[in-house]
């Protein structure tokens, strides 16, 4: 039994490695790496190094066992660390280019009436056991309310409701130098990617949002709305992002944030008190249109909080959008929470390597995001029959032509058999009645009754 289990595990590993190899070939990841400045002058190729690190969680190994002490790996740990610590490598461009190719693949499978969205959120990048990690700071975990050592991982994802693609991220430290536990350890050329990453790590969060959205839209990735939590749905942020894309976000209850409503400047709580509420246990309590200080009109939708005896408020810049659609579309924001959970628990985000170099953290986080893209791609091609290509569409057109008629014919045939069993049955009248129904339906779709004759089973 032990030999059988070992053999099955080996077969599973080979199968996964084959799928990963197909993924790298299909989307030409080696070419993407080369065009983004990630090259090697000697030794093994960048693609083989990246693919080896990429594969680790899928074969049940961590970085130490899979790369450092693994005798089967044809290169040493120094080559892997050299790849991760490169200061001129544009990992952000790698992620955007791969995301653009996957978007083109998913976009063909998405109906036009389904709203694609961008989702903005942040999560903690936990390095609680570290002391000398570059730009290390203390960040507040929103889920526990405690402070821990690490970074804030600001992420933006694309979702069509079925698949979620992480497209860009910023690893953020504290803007206050006094609050950082470890300072910058490298002297860098200000033109290189490493310097720009460190500079943005010490900037405020809201500064990055517009740049991230513009980068994503500039590579041809389209979305109808951007979804944000209450931490980001501030009037200044809304006014900035609304120049590029419509917004749906949760409103923060704060006496410091004001909207212009009914000619007066007031906070969200004051607006809610003055609105007429719907009776009973309605899910949507009220809705109204307010104005920001820059003159832009926004729609406020107040909904019942099912977990507390309280209310929540959603904001959208699309004032023509129905209240129910605002709630439905905002529900897609949950996709990024699933992504964070999956990345931390299964894809080894912030756990696989213990590098103290900031560039290595950026490179490894990018590879983790690429792993999630691979999983999303595999799930889509295995669950969505439209990935079979043109054959699917031809089969679908045939099914659309005959499925209703054939179903109606079978139902009426069963009804005739049932009437025969009752004893009171007029063959001529019933046959004429059913034939009239079938012929009328056939004329509507341009078929004949011979098309419904079932072939005998062989």
Task: Give the positions of each predicted feature.
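Electropositive, glycine- and tryptophan-enriched low-complexity nucleic-acid-binding patches
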Residues: 60, 78-82, 143-222, 299-312
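Short amphipathic alpha-helical "interface-anchor" segments enriched in bulky aromatics
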Residues: 120-124, 323-354
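Extended, non-catalytic structural segments that build the interaction scaffolds
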Residues: 52, 311-334
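Active-site-proximal, Lys/Arg-enriched surface segment
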Residues: 86-176
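A short, flexible helix-boundary coil/loop motif
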Residues: 1-44, 56, 72, 171-189, ...
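Acidic, His- and aromatic-enriched active-site or binding-groove loops in soluble protein domains
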Residues: 245-257
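Short, positively charged, Gly/Tyr-enriched micro-motifs
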Residues: 32-104, 112-113, 160-165, 209-219, ...
């Amino acid at each position: 039994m032990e030999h059988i289990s070992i053999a099955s595990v080996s077969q599973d590993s080979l199968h996964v490695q084959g799928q990963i190899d197909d993924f790298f070939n299909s989307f030409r990841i080696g070419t993407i790496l080369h065009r983004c400045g990630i090259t090697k002058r000697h030794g093994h190729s960048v693609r083989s190094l990246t693919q080896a690190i990429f594969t680790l969680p899928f074969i049940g190994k961590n970085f130490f066992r899979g790369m450092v002490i693994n005798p089967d790996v044809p290169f040493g740990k120094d080559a892997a660390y050299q790849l991760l610590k490169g200061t001129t490598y544009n990992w952000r461009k790698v992620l955007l280019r791969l995301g653009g190719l996957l978007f083109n693949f998913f976009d063909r499978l998405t109906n036009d009436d389904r709203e694609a969205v961008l989702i903005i959120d942040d999560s903690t990048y936990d390095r609680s056991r570290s002391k000398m990690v570059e730009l290390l700071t203390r960040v507040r975990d929103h889920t526990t309310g405690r402070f821990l050592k690490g970074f804030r991982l600001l992420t933006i994802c694309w979702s069509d409701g079925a698949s979620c693609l992480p497209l860009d991220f910023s690893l953020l430290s504290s803007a206050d130098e006094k609050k950082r536990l470890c300072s910058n350890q490298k002297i860098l050329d200000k033109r290189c990617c490493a310097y720009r990453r460190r500079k943005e790590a010490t900037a405020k969060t809201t500064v990055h949002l517009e740049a991230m959205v513009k980068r994503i839209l500039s590579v041809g990735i389209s979305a109808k709305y951007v979804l944000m939590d209450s931490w980001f749905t501030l009037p200044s942020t809304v006014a900035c992002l609304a120049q590029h894309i419509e917004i749906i976000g949760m409103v923060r209850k704060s006496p410091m944030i004001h909207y212009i409503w009914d000619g007066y400047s007031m906070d969200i709580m004051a607006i809610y008190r003055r609105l007429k509420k719907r009776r009973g246990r309605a899910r949507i309590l009220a809705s109204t249109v307010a104005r920001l200080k820059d003159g832009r009109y926004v729609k406020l939708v107040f909904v019942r909080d099912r977990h507390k005896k309280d209310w929540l408020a959603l904001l959208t810049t699309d004032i023509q959008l129905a209240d129910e659609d605002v709630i439905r579309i905002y529900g897609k924001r949950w996709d990024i929470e699933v992504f964070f959970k999956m990345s931390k628990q299964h894809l080894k985000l912030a756990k696989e390597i213990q590098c103290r170099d900031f560039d290595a953290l950026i490179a490894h986080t990018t590879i983790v995001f690429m792993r999630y893209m691979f999983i999303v791609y595999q799930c889509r091609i295995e669950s969505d029959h439209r990935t079979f290509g043109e054959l699917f569409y031809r089969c679908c057109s045939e099914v659309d032509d005959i499925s209703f008629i054939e179903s109606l014919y079978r139902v009426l045939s069963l009804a005739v058999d049932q009437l025969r069993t009752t004893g009171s049955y007029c063959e001529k009248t019933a046959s004429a009645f059913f034939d009239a129904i079938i012929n009328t339906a056939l004329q509507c779709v341009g078929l004949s009754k011979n098309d419904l004759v079932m072939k005998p089973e062989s």
